[in-house]
Structures are given as structure tokens and as C-alpha cells.
Design a protein with these regions (language model features):
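Structural motif
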Residues: 42-48
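Cleft-lining beta-strand/loop regions that shape enzyme active-site pockets
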Residues: 1, 16, 24-34, 48, ...
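Accessory interdomain/linker segments of ATP-dependent helicases and helicase-like nucleic-acid enzymes
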Residues: 1-15
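Short, small-residue-rich loop/turn micro-motifs
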Residues: 10-12, 19-24
Length: 201
């Protein structure tokens, strides 16, 4: 079954797009069908047809997407539940929304930590302590190295190996600063978060 990376609700006797999950369309694991460049679909639009077949409750919204995963699929959408003024759009559904929904959860957590800490704390989720976990850590930790502390989230971690690399990075000690005459002072080591850290497990 092909999936659109979206939540739906029933309104005015039609399926309406309640939420569109965004991703990174250059990354095959985070491709989001409805947020790709040039796809003119918005939250609040109605999904009226799939490959020329009308879609309306009580039919299951996914029933018309059988066999469409990773295949060009024609959908008809409109801002109203009417065919008048609707538009046909070619999209490519994904086989799984897991990574899109997980990314949304991560980003919601990161924004919440940022808001509640007044921008002082970083948030890093680790899916495991294997290659994907190291990738997540490096990407999120160093992108927030200007923070005063960090929340490391180990919930739903799938296991792996002893995370000595991550432990070493978290345990880095601030040794000093470089004071530049015409620039921003930098730390030594250059990269790191040197303040308090907490882990959610």
C-alpha cells in the first residue's frame, strides 16, 4: 500500500488532509510525497480521487492506494470538497511512513526543549547505538553546540553496542578559549557542549 505521509480527517463527506509530514526529499529514507518540490498540496485540501477513482467515506482512504508504493500516482485535490476547481497532481507514495513520523516526533521534542529552556538546551534522540545512532548523534549534537546543556533522549532505543564514541563526546572537558582580535572567541576543543547533560531512558 502506498502512503502519502499525511493524517486525514472526514469533513463534508470527504477525506481532508489534516497534517502533512515533511521530510528531506534528497534523502530516500525521509522522502515525503506531499512536500516534494512542485507538489501543490496543502494541509486542509480535500483528497477527491486516486488514479481516476473517486474517494469518499465510508471507503477506507488507503483502499485506492494498493500497489502504488514508489509508483507515480495521480491524485485529485481541491480546497473545497467539490470537483469544480480541483487539480490533478502526480505524486509518488512511499511504502512506509515510519521515518517521517519519527522525524516529526523528534522535531516536536527538540522544539519543546528549546522553548522550555529559552533556547539554552540541545535535544538529541538516539535511535540505537549502531551506525544510525552515531549518525543521528553527530548530526543533532554538533548542530546545537552553541547550547549551554543537552537532553539526550534514549527512549525507544533499539540497542546496539557500547556507545564509547558518544560517551567520549559527551564527556569532553572545556580546556580553554581562543580570543580572536577580529572575530568571535572559540573554544578548545572547538566543538562540544560543555554544560550539564541529562538522559531520558
Amino acid at each position: 500500500v502506498g502512503l502519502l505521509g499525511a493524517d486525514f480527517e472526514i469533513e463534508n463527506g470527504r477525506y481532508r488532509i489534516k497534517r502533512i509530514y515533511t521530510g528531506e526529499n534528497w534523502n530516500p529514507d525521509l522522502r515525503a510525497p506531499l512536500s516534494a518540490p512542485g507538489i501543490q498540496v496543502a494541509e486542509g485540501d480535500y483528497l477527491l480521487e486516486v488514479n481516476g477513482r473517486p474517494l469518499a467515506p465510508p471507503a477506507n482512504v488507503y483502499s485506492l492506494f494498493e500497489g502504488t508504493a514508489n509508483r507515480q500516482t495521480l491524485i485529485r485535490v481541491n480546497k473545497t470538497p467539490s470537483l469544480e476547481g480541483s487539480r490533478l497532481i502526480t505524486i509518488v507514495p512511499v511504502a512506509s511512513e515510519d521515518t517521517l513520523r519519527t522525524r516529526a516526533w523528534i522535531e516536536n521534542n527538540r522544539r519543546l526543549v528549546d522553548k522550555l529552556s529559552n533556547g539554552k538546551l540541545a535535544y538529541v534522540w538516539l535511535p540505537n547505538t549502531a551506525n544510525p545512532g552515531y549518525t543521528y548523534f553527530t548530526r543533532y549534537f554538533y548542530a546545537q553546540q552553541d547550547k549551554d546543556g543537552a537532553v539526550i533522549d534514549e527512549r525507544y532505543n533499539h540497542g546496539g553496542m557500547v556507545a564509547d564514541y558518544i560517551v567520549n563526546e559527551l564527556d569532553r572537558k572545556l580546556m580553554g578559549y581562543f580570543a580572536l582580535r577580529d572575530g568571535t572567541p572559540s573554544t578548545s576543543p572547538i566543538a562540544g557542549i560543555y554544560g550539564p547533560k541529562v538522559m531520558l531512558i
